Amino acid sequence: MESSELGQCADGFVAWLGRLGYSPRTCEAQVALLRHLGHWLADRGLPLSSLTSEVAGEYAAARRGRAQLRSERALRPVLSYLRELGAVPSAAVVVPREPVDVLLARFGGWLSRERGLAPATVSSYLHQARPFADACAGQFGTLTAVRVAGLATEGAAGLRPRSAQVRANAVRALLRFAWLEGMTAVPLAEFVGSFAAPAGPAIPKGLSPAQAAEFLVFVRSAPGGLRNEPMMALLLRLALRAGEAAGLLLDDIAWRQGVITVRGKRNRVDQVPLPADVGGPLARYLRDGRPAGTAHRQVFLALDAPHAPVTHAAVTSVAGRALRDAGISGNGAAHLLRHTAACGVLAGGGGLAEAGELLRHDGPQVTAVYARSDLAALRSIARPWPEEGGPR
């Protein structure tokens, strides 16, 4: 296909856009952009096969004086369609070339494969470990205990205690990987110092039963409520994490059995009962709100075309915005809803083991912090303050 022939594929482009859920008005604007792009390439004597990401950037820059569709983002539907046709080069894949980049790419693969960490967690580890890897130029063979301790301390300078501890954890993981891969003569992870963090984890806080009910009513009536109500109910009632809600697949819902499959941290898979107050909103969304004709298997999709699957960050953003708009204050929006589910178990007379099962924790030591939030249970075992002259 020649660049001057781009306008001839308008009908196919419109059909493709329609399948992705774009409105007729957006389709019309995108077709105009497609035709204009063809003329722009032809005027410069450029074949369609030369439309790389760099050339697309030049075209976007040439449109900046226009009122609309003047950014590289606006070109994404056009480029995606032409790439599917094989008419233009695929998006360039960045291949690590620098030694540190190669090292971190291998480290990321190890974290995902051997440790079972989620992509977002792997990305965080790589970000936190990069300053250390850069400081030693990826040359781990010459590292000593003293050098490791010094670099770790320098890398934590200026960070808050909790942030410094997060970075230290990432560096330790990197050094364990280096030891297992034979890059260091001795294990060095233990020489990364610990950084004083606030005394004990914060007491988990959740919404009151009244707040939780009002929150879901608010979400249901707000824009996007058909999708957002079941999404928030999964966090609030079943204690799913944001990433777990985002990753939920259509095949994970067993309606007859009344359970869903939850894929959690470290590749853990659990079967979780699906109560009516979660299953009802979920069924309504799938019947009346989820875009039709999509090939995506994820349950929750973006409200706007092209209706891509929602991300961990999108679920967190929906939770934060809904809490704020509902006038409910609190930190860590998605986790606040998750904490609500666990606190509800304790308030209803359940024990820590039951709360840990709901939260899908790896062990009781992780759930132990919730004992501090169950004040009624703590009062029942607290000894009275000794009075003067009384028994001690």
Residue positions per predicted region:
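Conserved catalytic core of the tyrosine transesterase superfamily
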Residues: 1-392
